[in-house]
């Protein structure tokens, strides 16, 4: 099978270059593209690739239980391969135009299951080495922080796609839309569909206190422009929010996983929980505050623009 690694073809499978990390562009995306092409050639679905990535990641977590550097290195390799599969599932979905809410939910579940495996095995390793079982309490706090940080980063990264590329590129539905879908769907006969909407609702509701101004802005857009983002707002959002992408990415996968790898090689993996609780929470608090202030400014600009226009112009100012 001939595999084409032309740069433009790989870039066609990005969500958007603005939200891609350096290591993703030059490492995970090219490998993911190769895996996606291979998966397509043997007719694997994106969800199958996601499940394979989850299994690989869970096994890597188990290998972090052992004190042997050699075994830990194998675990690190498997975790990197799991990340490549995580990249490949989305690239395959975009390549085959088979993106779905089910795929997105499964992708999120996969990430949480992998880190659950890592957390549990790190705790068991710490206890096996003769230390306190209180490490589980620390791990639970770190896990809760991890969930909020990663959910926040993922939510606003999708928000960036919503405003800069358009609503159809955003993988997260609005709260009102999801509530309506949840009320309309019946558990009987539509269990899976309703469960997917339920998971996404819980995800959005868990971020309510961190996304107040953003919800005001999106509600205004839905009401006035019917989700047709005006070009001036798209440009202003990109100019103001593009620098925030580094914080979104810092709070999701790569930074925490490479920190974990370094601590494993230093034989101090328990410090990973401290990194989660202290360093990443400081980054999160700073980024969340900065994001809220930037969005408030965009809300004030949007209100000023819409208040000063006749109704007819409001509907014409669309992309």
Segments (PLM) and residue ranges:
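Long, highly hydrophobic alpha-helical transmembrane signal-anchor segments
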Residues: 106-181
